[in-house]
């Protein structure tokens, strides 16, 4: 509500969304407004904790934490004032995306610093000095990948294919994934750039980077890139497809969620599968706008002939020595037939008869429409059933097909390159996990794990290893973050409960818990806000909120 010239104006916020409904990931670690030493420290620790919690156990090591901490100390002060703090927020979103993709610390650190380099706030020499030659090499390669499409006309499919193949065969796959995460962020922030640049960027994404994401196995990322570029390049076509899909999307997604839960329970309760399968992973998906457009336009299908709008993948963790997994997949199909209406004409057994590229999976379809003439009609749901081993092989095999790498020999060679690069990435920076207790006692290991965030951050700040954070160490940190000695003194007074002029691990742990509580409260606030927004929007659609606003406005004006 605002007042203009004595007149009360009741603001009715717009509810229409224009951007594609792309997949939403967990939010990036929060920023805290710059200012006092306490806020700067809270910002650094909050971001550090958020990223390390996202990293997989196989890459979360002491050397990884040290590298990530250095990257944050370098990037936070450099980006905090850039574009009103938006550059820093975007850098952390990219870092969170990379952590969610289970990239190692070198990739995540390079992702943080790349944004600072693109903003002109950090030089390559500084990045290499702080992060080492490995991360610096990733930064250089990611810049090469970024510039590769600008050297050719990507509208020409042959030229675009050559660029894709050159990138896959010539660069570290981690540098490719780094650039993909940065491209996704850029696609979400194109509104402020000229229209011609929006189109050029979107075309590069559609022809080069989205297929690359498929080729390296990052299917969810590729789907977002496709939908965003489709929306920018073909807005009218996008609107048509969006109108068709969105009309049934909410209902279909609810059905998917229910089916997933019901199927997991049924599979876990099956006697035969209990003996042959150690676990189940069920994933559901609703067809993306771009993928639907390709089926309708490129393949010439009618809407009723698009049979995979709803999709589910069932991955079986097949027990060793229990056969080749084919029988377990067949049994899973039998369980599904007992739950839903099977469509036999849509069954394709690529396990018994693998595709030419070796792809193995059992494809079936089920009719999810409600029974009876008055029942709700829904599209068929395609279900893919495979073992974990079949899925691991399919990730790269199908990815290469989706990436438009048509030459089988070239595809095999590039597949080998990607697998080898992934192995290198998995081994990079790997050392013994720093648990703080190497006795091997389970209880001690569990306690160390639960206190991991506090312990590792404290060790990084306690540079001389004496078990306390001195005034000198705290001042050095504040200076690294762009603050000064007065901020360090203020922070010491705030945290030093026993007034001995240093911070013990217990005093530091108390501060960490305050930081974590603040983040949890803010997350819960966001969750409640979204729930209320959805509920009030439904009420708004009935006109009740408009009546309330008018009555409120009348009272305010008359008063």
Curated annotation (Swiss-Prot):
GO cellular component assignments: chloroplast
InterPro entries associated with the record: EF-hand-dom_pair, EF_Hand_1_Ca_BS, EF_hand_dom, HD_domain, NT_sf, RelA_SpoT
Residues annotated to bind Ca(2+) 1: 462, 464, 466, 468, 473
Reported regulation of activity: Activated by calcium.
Top-level taxon of the source organism: Eukaryota
Chain residues that bind Ca(2+) 2: 496, 498, 500, 502, 507
Comment, domains: The calcium-binding sites of the 2 EF-hand domains are required for enzyme activity.
Listed name of the protein: GTP diphosphokinase CRSH2, chloroplastic
